[in-house]
Amino acid sequence: MAQLDSAKNVKVDNIPIEATDVMTGDKDRRRFLYYQLKISMLKAKQIDIIVSFLMESGVRMLLKDFKDALNRGVRIRILTGNYLGITQPSALYLIKKELGNRVDLRFYNEKARSFHPKSYIFHFDNASEIYIGSSNISKSALTSGIEWNYRFSSLTDEKNYRLFYETFVDLFEHHSIIIDDAELKRYSKNWHKPAVAKDLAKYDNPQDEEDTKVEVLFQPRGAQIEALYALEDSRAEGATRGLVQAATGIGKTYLAAFDSAKYKRVLFVAHREEILKQAAISFQNVRHSEDYGFFYGKQKTVDKSVIFASVSTLGREEYLSEEYFSPEYFDYIVIDEFHHAVNEQYQRIVQYFKPQFLLGLTATPERMDGKNIYEICDYNVPYEISLKEAIDKGMLVPFHYYGIYDETDYSGLHLVKGHYEEKALNETYIGNVARYELIYKYYMKYRSKRALGFCCSRQHAEDMAKEFSNRGIPSVAVYSNANGEFSEDREKAIEKLMNQEIKVIFSVDMFNEGVDIPALDMVMFLRPTESPIVFQQQLGRGLRTYRGKEYLNVLDFIGNYQKAGLAPLILSGTKAFDEKRACEYNELEYPDNCMVDFDMHLIDLFRELDKKSLSIKERIVREYYKVKELLENRVPTRMELFTYMEDSVYQYCMKHAKENPFRRYMEFLQDLQELSEEEQRLYHGIGREFIAVMETTDMQKVYKMPILYSFYNDGNIRMEVTEEEVLKSWKQFFDNGTNWKDFAENISYEVYKRMTDKQHLSKAKSMPIKYLKASGKGFFIEKEGYALALREDLKDIIELEAFKAQMKDILEYRTMEYYRRRYLQGSQI
């Protein structure tokens, strides 16, 4: 090879390496392509790479070299393929996260043509060199895999070098698509782990770390890289709160540890001590620091950088004070199992502290017991990956689901606040020989090494453990404060299950969240499915990957209980839980390699239940009274009705405007004779018309809300508002979280922050103020010296407490519904 400016003999990772033109991989490190590329990168002025796919393991190996080159001003271009989905999204996100837009990263974009090049081109001051061969960017291909690559210089073969390089330039400039954030998100959202990836993983598993010394044990991997990138991007856009919705298996605690690593003082909140102890280990591994403490029980650490606190302790008012922590004490707060954040003690913590960023973590963000958690994080969900997506991406094992017809009759069982009573279920299950036989029969049919059965009560769990043990299947019952004949401590039960001293654990609410047993190969649903959230939590307990585990068997014993048709909808990842679709379960799309099989008797049952279903109006009214019962027989506001209403019913409301109570809530309450005396006065006067305008005014954008809030004025309602008052309300509204995104299309956060008061006011006048005057049925008028005014005949009603309550409720509900709708539209991209 003719003389180049590239380095020749160097130490790489303390290993003496001599430059060579022939690389064959295998066991001779001197023949690893990885080391030769590092040598070439040391003095390169420009780097061009074309490979058919990128793997996270390979990108991670080259990151430091890329960074060093970029910091020297080196231009880097990478062209890769998206054919068959072999390029891992995490590899692309890793480049974006660590190198930003300094690398020109593109996909080859010709769908009808195969794409299999593997070439690395380095340009120096006096010449260039090119590697041609078989290595894509993966750890195996760069190191010990049998990969043949050859290097030659433009000085020795100018003609052929020129042919390769000019072809690269043509492909890069004319047959590619830039991998920007939108393209990357699309690719990741649609990416399914290809079948060939399993074979690639065998050879690409980072097990030979001594060979390369480039792996770090605790570092972001897979979906964590994507989530970290999204969180950083979200904060750059002004977000101070965010929710990460991620199925079991991606390592949410480690994600929080990585994301919070740059912050000095961190608070981690969870509801169980064992979760806090596990989290402390994860944070210690990432931070490499002993500077952490606990805040629960008798431990009240306040002087450490990272505090792990139980919600039951920290959530007390006595501890939420300057004596322990000031509101600004923590820079970063993590709320684990964020679906609990609607509860009172969580709310105290969330409302007291003012961190730079608050991160919520959950696998099941849907409203727990009807409560809305998205509002707590300002409807900001930087990253989400559903159970279905996690299976499609190979993060979880597939399931084989068997819906088994159970003749148990639930028709006479009483419902309390929409749920079956524990006592009634016990009387139905315990001693039910036919049901024992059914469960045992199917357990034996799909016999497992390690199974988990979900029961309705302690007595039910004890009864099932006794029944199975008597039939020769060693089993235990796990529940809180256990003292039964077959009961066992949870940790001891897991140990026995892993050692195969027992075959089945029957549990009550002890394995719904926070505890996984990766070795489980069967879960059994032995009680009615009443909540999509609980169903997903319980299913998720068995979906963790484990050596030798190909899939999870799911046995679901379904009877004629309410919501019997939920299972197929949950399994398919359907967000709209319309139980009428249960009969069409074969038409639903399930995760890759999953199987769903329903007993034919169940299809008949679903059809029968469908015929008995209520009309839309009847369902809404029934839901209203259920919510009222939850509120101790108090008439719910719009916000409360939304908050506690089942998603399926709310979706009906949104689809059927005529029956939607949120569009004419006072009329809805009047029909049910639920209005108070003062509300009756409003209803039979001009107040009813004005309230209807606020309920139904068009909301394609959110601009009208800050104008209406300026009138509301924290309950001291104004008849007119000045430009200064409008401007204050307007900026306060759009400065909150990421609300600024609704200010204008294609505007960046930096541009928004530079906007002047004059520009803000101009926008307010030209849009919402103009349209309120034009479409507000004459209630909004011009008045000299003011930006906008209310019609004079409203003066008599604005002092009524009933009107103030109605206006506040409407503004809160409509603002919340707008951002909920925006989030749902964004999540479908």
Task: Please name every model-derived segment.
Residues 1-221, 225:
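PLD/PLD-like phosphodiesterase catalytic module centered on the HKD motif
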Residues 132, 504-529, 534-537, 541, ...:
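A short beta-strand element within the Helicase C-terminal
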Residues 187-220, 425, 435-441, 445, ...:
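Long, largely alpha-helical accessory region at the distal end of helicase-like NTP-driven motors
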Residues 236-259:
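Walker A/P-loop
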Residues 277, 294-295, 299-302, 319-321, ...:
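Conserved helicase ATPase core of P-loop NTP-dependent helicases/translocases
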Residues 340-401:
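Post-DEXD/H (motif II) to motif III coupling segment of the RecA-like Helicase ATP-binding lobe
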Residues 381-452:
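Conserved interdomain linker/interface between the two RecA-like ATPase lobes of SF2 helicase motors
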Residues 532, 541-575:
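Conserved segment of the helicase C-terminal RecA-like domain
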